[in-house]
């Protein structure tokens, strides 16, 4: 009886490993130069069970400036009730304000990139996600740090860390006037 139980346990363990490897995924690649279009396309994909995978901004293979987003979906268990917001601006003050408004509504950070705007600036673009299920959204406090000096950024990151903020990402943005800034995004979630 013990040998039979051990053999059955090994067989179940082996078959569960096979199930993991046989999972299938579907993908949607979204590409556009307009943030409003990207947000609409991401939410349309979310309605079909896709979730955010990754983002990149830059020059496409045909020479245009675009933001590329990969949306992913498990064929067996598609996601449901996700909503996305895409923020993009070359003004850090505006970005901080919009980011905090989204945090107040429970939107969580997914990713960020930089892409060139029609006005010659390099806009920081941030993608946020919120689960639309019945659970109340938790408030998230965001902090945006921006400086042209890396030594200043390190000092500000340490101060934010001491205040309980978790680092999420960093990019170098360029304003329409030609200035470059190191921009870090951090968050603190209310308990």
Predicted regions, residues:
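Terminus-proximal functional modules
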Residues: 18-191
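Bacterial N-terminal signal peptides that target proteins for export
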Residues: 1-7
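Bacterial N-terminal signal peptides
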Residues: 7-16
């Amino acid at each position: 009886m013990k040998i039979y139980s051990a053999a059955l346990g090994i067989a179940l363990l082996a078959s569960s490993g096979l199930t993991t490897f046989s999972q299938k995924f579907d993908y949607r690649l979204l590409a556009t130069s307009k943030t409003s279009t990207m947000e609409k396309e991401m939410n349309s994909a979310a309605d079909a069970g896709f979730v955010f995978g990754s983002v990149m901004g830059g020059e496409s293979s045909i020479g245009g400036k675009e933001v590329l987003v990969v949306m992913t979906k498990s064929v067996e268990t598609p996601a449901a009730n996700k909503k996305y917001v895409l923020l993009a601006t070359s003004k850090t003050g505006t970005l901080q304000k919009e980011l905090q408004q989204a945090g107040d509504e429970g939107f969580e950070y997914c990713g960020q990139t930089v892409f060139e705007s029609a006005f010659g600036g390099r806009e920081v673009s941030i993608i946020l996600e919120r689960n639309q299920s019945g659970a109340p959204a938790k408030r998230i406090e965001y902090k945006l740090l921006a400086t042209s000096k890396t030594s200043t950024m390190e000092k500000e990151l340490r101060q934010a860390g001491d205040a309980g903020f978790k680092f999420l990402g960093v990019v170098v943005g360029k304003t329409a006037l030609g200035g470059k800034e190191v921009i870090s995004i951090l968050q603190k979630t209310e308990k």
